[in-house]
From Swiss-Prot:
EC numbers for this chain: 3.1.-.-
Binding site for Zn(2+): H118, H122, H128
Protein name (Swiss-Prot/TrEMBL): Endoribonuclease YbeY
Gene3D superfamilies in UniProt: Metalloproteases ('zincins'), catalytic domain (3.40.390.30)
Native source organism of the sequence: Mycobacterium sp. (strain KMS)
């Protein structure tokens, strides 16, 4: 799976974290591992231009998704007929997202992870134009984000335990000499 990130926003964000959450969602949704995804981070001015050009709406927004093909919800490029290798593009605006994060009371990293999940789901055919679609998409979005956060916490604790074990083993070797 190939995920490329191009940060043109001027704001320092963890590209590794964005790739991690996108990869997690793509794997959880059983998307063919050969799929490719592009993520672009823009400043508010560039995002406002894109928002007007594609959605005919003024001002910047937090996330926009540009799927390569229109898919039905649940329709994914699965094997044996994987469909398009390129899922599409997700465009994020960290400056706009930072304001939303502050209002919501969480970090920019958390907000960008949420928006990445949201963007990937749009690429996979999910939408929230109708109330029933919104309920389905937002429930799945919440579930996937919670699972990713739990996975990150578990990986952190495993890394810490591995480091403690390594230090303990190093000390025991020291005393054996």
């Amino acid at each position: 799976m190939s995920i490329e990130v191009s940060n043109e926003s001027g704001i320092d964000v963890s590209e590794e974290e964005l790739i991690s959450v996108a990869r997690f969602v793509i794997e959880k949704m059983n998307v063919n591992p050969a799929a490719e995804l592009s993520m672009v981070l823009l400043d508010t001015s560039s995002m406002a231009d894109l928002h007007m050009r594609w959605m005919d709406l003024p001002g910047p927004t937090d996330v926009m998704s540009f799927p390569m093909d229109e898919l039905e919800p649940g329709g994914r490029p699965d094997a044996p007929e994987p469909g398009p290798a390129m899922l599409g593009d997700i465009v994020l605006c960290p400056e706009f997202a930072a304001k939303q994060a502050e209002t919501a009371g969480h970090s920019l990293g958390h907000e960008l992870a949420l928006l990445t999940v949201h963007g990937v789901l749009h690429l996979l055919g999910y939408d929230h134009a109708e109330p029933d679609e919104e309920k389905e998409m937002f429930a799945l979005q919440r579930e996937l984000l919670e699972e990713w956060v739990a996975h990150q916490v578990e990986a952190y604790h495993l890394d810490r335990q591995t480091e403690r074990d390594r230090r303990l083993l190093d000390k025991s070797r020291y005393f054996d000499e």
